[in-house]
Amino acid sequence: MRLTTLWQNRSPGDRHLSTYFCFAAVRLLLVFVPQLGYVHPDEFFQSVEVMTGDHFRLEHTRTWEFNNSLPVRSIVLPFALLRIPWSFYEFVAECLKAWWQLELLGTYAYVVFPRLIYTLISFSNDYCLFRICRLYGLRFEIRLLAMGSSWILLVFGTRTFSNSLEMAMCSWLLCLVSECMLRTNTVVYKKEFLEEKYDKAESISERVRIWKLKNSLPAHNLQHLMAMSTICVAGVFNRPTFLLFGAPMVFFWLLRGMGTRSITFRDFNLRIALFCLCALPALVLFIFCDSLYYQHLTLGELHMMHLSIDNFVFTPWNFIKANLDSAQTASHGVHPCYVHLMVNMPMLFNVLALASLGAFAQLLLRFFRAEYQVLPRFQSIVSLMSGAIFVPLFFLSLINHQEPRFLLPVTFPLILLHAPKLITGFSAKYPFQKDHPLLRLFYDKLLSSKASGPYLLKIWYVSNVALTLFFGFIHQAGVYPLAADISHVIATKPAATHVHLITSHIYSLPLHLINIPSSRVLHFNRLTHQRYRRPRDFYMYEYGGLPLDSLLQKVKLISGSCEVKKSGPSRRRYKLYLAIPASLSADLHEALVHSNASSYLNFELLKVFYPHLSTEAFPHLQGRHPCDVDAPHWAHDDLRGTCSAEQLPAFSFAYLNKQFSSFVHQLGLALYEIDVTRNKPRSVVIKKASMTETAA
């Protein structure tokens, strides 16, 4: 009873801290569940696909970013964070397989193990936030709670994005700069205070004592220099956009103590020179490793010292050149300059985005009104964090391709500055200089603690949980179970049988998740000690958002080619599959009916992986067949549920229930098996298999 009373009477800070630990546990748990949601193809194709495929000699896709002729992705960090840990994991897996027949290498491991590494790295953001709060005497409980409950950490922090590493490195850099600023301000203040005392001292003994005290002050001018320069080099090679995030942080580090008697431009220039000098070892290491990996530099050339500038690869420069090509960036999507500010910021940070934009607008207004006395001091933590938010935001808005994940490094400074507003409201005191009736009404009804304080934390929770569920478990969530199912098909298929998979209106399928030994490299048989090359038996065709009529033409071409090989001398058997969102099932049926493919192509629905939402094929909000809405299973042999005329039925609960059922059933990824029949043309070419549906 006493423990219950103590638990109920604990302070708000303790409640926030205990809630944070719950969210931290959820972050770890989401790694092992695992999250089925597929946020963006770059999660796999910028690191995991290549590293896992190379290490385990699996079939994998090497995107244009890893092209040996002009590589734009550095291999050092993915190699250190994935390839080396995979070696230890493989050793443990082989031992457990030999001793207890446990198989730890498969689709699940290829997803979970890299995510576990990146999730552990994500906790460095929490540590840096806690450290800065302790250094500056700030409340860390609510800030940690905001960080831990953010969908950015729950989703992006547990995924293998280069943006997640960029966020962690920016957090470390901010932590080091903040510590250096505090130490410099403290030491400079004490030094100038002692110098004044020294000048006023009358006796020699007192001057000696003060001189000893001044010399005992700790060094501060070059604090954390090596660590900061190394982080900057690693950040730029990870993502060259780190230049935009790191530049204001390094600038504040260089300006520490400027304007005092102790720090002059000589110190400023010395810091710049030594910073560049300390960055050289990391710079040489990254360039050397990338040059070896992309085969621009060989050990033979290194031994013979036959070297030229062409032997070295500088991937950040290649990245910048590629992104300066407007046609290249346009292929990924062109966005207006206001997307980051008006869409991505509110999407990532919801109420805290509004708080930060409002606070920055207030700072700009006071600056242009020359109200300098109420502005934060330039060499303060508020100025540092504000610069870390809005300087990169401004320059990133000038780039025509804008995605929410590009702003992940803004998370740390934004939460540090504005997380307390989740409990205090947008403004605890009247923020305007003039007391105008309209401004007073605006403050009382929206900004004040009484008006906004009780609701902001609730809005924060609801929005972040909703976005975590959507991107973590619904968005493109059928791709992972599809890969696991195809992996099982290939493992159990008859010998000398080719498997062909056609996908449409879904994200690219990472080949390494299917767990197929590569046909492009030599494999080693440990029993016979012989090397062999495995013939290719899996083919994948990805057609993105291709219209269904054009998709059927592709299906006919692929099936025709397979039939030719099957009837040829090799008698090559095959299995042909089609994976499309369930929302397109009815459109697929209509396209088949109106094409001549219906006379010989038989589509058999094998499974529907739930849930799955492709924004490229959004479910129909109104069922196509109002008499009996049951998508995607309305295409039975008798076409039950179809209407010759789609009249609007009476508005009723039964009708709403059917419409809702239609919408829910469309939230899936349908897998069809296609075979060719030469029999009498059938009235229906899609049939439902006897197999049960698989809920992913």
UniProtKB/Swiss-Prot annotation:
Keywords: Endoplasmic reticulum, Glycosyltransferase, GPI-anchor biosynthesis, Membrane, Transferase, Transmembrane, Transmembrane helix. The keyword Endoplasmic reticulum applies. GO terms for molecular function: alpha-1,2-mannosyltransferase activity; mannosyltransferase activity. It holds the Pfam family Glyco_transf_22. The chain crosses the membrane at residues 100-120, 125-142, 149-169, 185-205, 227-247, 338-358. InterPro entries: GPI_mannosylTrfase. GO terms for cellular component: endoplasmic reticulum; endoplasmic reticulum membrane. It is found in: Endoplasmic reticulum membrane. Its main location: endoplasmic reticulum. Pathway: Glycolipid biosynthesis; glycosylphosphatidylinositol-anchor biosynthesis. The keyword Translocase does not apply. It is an enzyme of class 2 (transferase). GO terms for biological process: GPI anchor biosynthetic process. Its EC number is 2.4.1.-. It is a multi-pass membrane protein. Mannosyltransferase involved in glycosylphosphatidylinositol-anchor biosynthesis. Transfers a fourth mannose to some trimannosyl-GPIs during GPI precursor assembly. Belongs to the glycosyltransferase 22 family. PIGZ subfamily. This is GPI mannosyltransferase 4. The gene is PIG-Z.
